[in-house]
């Protein structure tokens, strides 16, 4: 049981880039296809009034960088500090905006990340 808990902690601690690399590795090596969020919701089977209420009360948010404003270097530095990415990866993420900076975070954490990026000069949207 401790091994499973350690694995869960490692998975939760992955950066976006590391999670993407893991998904690619699982797909290439083991032919495991990542499920989209829509499929997971559909597989849940809900569909009644309860399902509608859950959709209205969003608990997980994606922090999406939509623009870099006037201070690209500061935005790249902030993205690096948030994601743990290297310089090249963070620069690519910023240059190719809109891109998610963090996914599936709480409202409070999403607001904090949004404020950090906006303070650096970036434009952010919560989804």
UniProtKB/Swiss-Prot annotation:
Q: Which family does it belong to?
A: Belongs to the bacterial ribosomal protein bL12 family.
Q: Which GO terms describe its biological process?
A: translation
Please tell me the species this chain comes from: Salinibacter ruber (strain DSM 13855 / M31)
Q: Which InterPro entries match?
A: Ribosomal_bL12, Ribosomal_bL12_C, Ribosomal_bL12_C/ClpS-like, Ribosomal_bL12_oligo, Ribosomal_bL12_oligo_N_sf
The free-text function statement in the UniProt record for this protein reads: Forms part of the ribosomal stalk which helps the ribosome interact with GTP-bound translation factors. Is thus essential for accurate translation.
Looking up CDD domains in the UniProt record yields:
Ribosomal_L7_L12
UniProt protein name = Large ribosomal subunit protein bL12
Q: How does it assemble?
A: Homodimer. Part of the ribosomal stalk of the 50S ribosomal subunit. Forms a multimeric L10(L12)X complex, where L10 forms an elongated spine to which 2 to 4 L12 dimers bind in a sequential fashion. Binds GTP-bound translation factors.
State the Gene Ontology terms under molecular function.
Answer: mRNA binding; structural constituent of ribosome
């Amino acid at each position: 049981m401790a091994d499973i808990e350690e694995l869960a902690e490692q998975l939760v601690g992955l950066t976006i880039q590391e999670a993407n690399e893991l998904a690619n590795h699982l797909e290439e090596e083991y032919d495991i296809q990542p499920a989209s969020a829509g499929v997971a919701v559909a597989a849940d089977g809900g569909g009644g009034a309860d399902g509608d209420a859950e959709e209205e009360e969003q608990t997980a948010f994606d922090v999406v960088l939509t623009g870099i404003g006037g201070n690209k270097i500061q935005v790249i530095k902030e993205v690096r500090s948030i994601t743990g990415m290297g310089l090249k990866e963070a620069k690519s993420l910023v240059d190719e905006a809109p891109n998610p900076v963090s996914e599936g975070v709480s409202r409070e954490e999403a607001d904090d990340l949004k404020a950090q990026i906006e303070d650096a000069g970036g434009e952010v949207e919560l989804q």
